[in-house]
Amino acid sequence: MKAWGGPDRPADDRERTLREIEAAGIDLDPTGSHDAGDRDHDHGTGPHQHPHHQSRPGEPPVIGIVGAGAVGTALGVALDRAGWPIHAVASRDPGRRDRFRSLVPAVRAFADAVPLVEEVELIILAVPDDAIPRVAGELHMYGGQAMVHTSGLLGADALSGAMAAGTQAGSFHPLVAFADLERAVAAFHGATIAIEGDDQLLDLLARMAEVLGATPVRLAPGSKPAYHAAAVLAAGGFDALLDAIAELGRLAGLDEAGSLAVYAPLIEQTLGNARALGIDRALTGPATRGDRGTIRAHLAELEARAPDVAALYARLADREIGIAERRGSLTPEAASDLRSAADPALARPD
């Protein structure tokens, strides 16, 4: 089984990630084909010929990025620092163009993506998911070019509007949180990147991930919505959970920084336990003990002082009870009894 990883990545971290990915049944060997289509934009007149800026054998492709938001800028900066220069960027926002140019000084900047296509070999669409089909449909690729998007939800078929004979389409989705530029650039090293495309393009995208120090994986066909929903829970969903923790921390006299300082070690320990022992064995708390009174007391307090958090607590408690039942800590009867205790309506004071 073939796998890729960045040459500068610590061996133990890389091997651990690869073992976990392989154990999860994810195919690390991109040997399947993806038919991106061969329709020509001139309706059967044959493939366009790419006019400018072709890379030499062994060199990185000539890259252009459409979109200079958080993802496009961080990816462009990371690739440029890793020795894969960005030739051009396109953004309708002049402030974003100027910022990208300040970070990647040699880049050519365009307000429109159409002239960018004339100058590059690999086009990266780093635009919002809803805009990808429309933007792709406005761009006419040339034979020998490839286009990828950075969406975690959409497949390569979202780029069908840009396809012509002799072109390729794919996707390149980094599992990175793009809240801060420098932190995101650093986070590529050690991240996982989901790639999609035919064999030749997959090889290129795997090398592109490798230079960033990331591990590329190819997902099962049709699995991207579930994969991306999990990513949203791991990032935005987890941040929402931290917000709920901080809200309860305020009731205990802690500010946000104080709550993070108090609960971060427990969060990190739980993640470490899950990685070492598995999710089921990592579960702790009243659900594992069948502690009905504690759950009722928590919900009564939250209903009175933080009702929004009470609803979240109840939903998570139901999930915890399911884990406890699955691992054998609770009988089906005990789990059913505990679920009734986790109903916020039953915990409200009369």
Language-model-detected regions and their locations in the chain:
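Rossmann-like NAD(P)(H) cofactor-binding subdomain of soluble oxidoreductases
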Residues: 94, 104, 108-183
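Phosphate-coordination loops involved in phosphoryl transfer and adenosine-cofactor binding
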Residues: 59-62, 144, 190
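Short phosphate-binding/catalytic loops that engage adenosine nucleotides
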Residues: 84-85, 167, 214, 254
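Hydrophobic Val/Ile/Leu positions in short beta-strands of Rossmann-like dinucleotide-binding domains
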Residues: 64-65, 125, 195
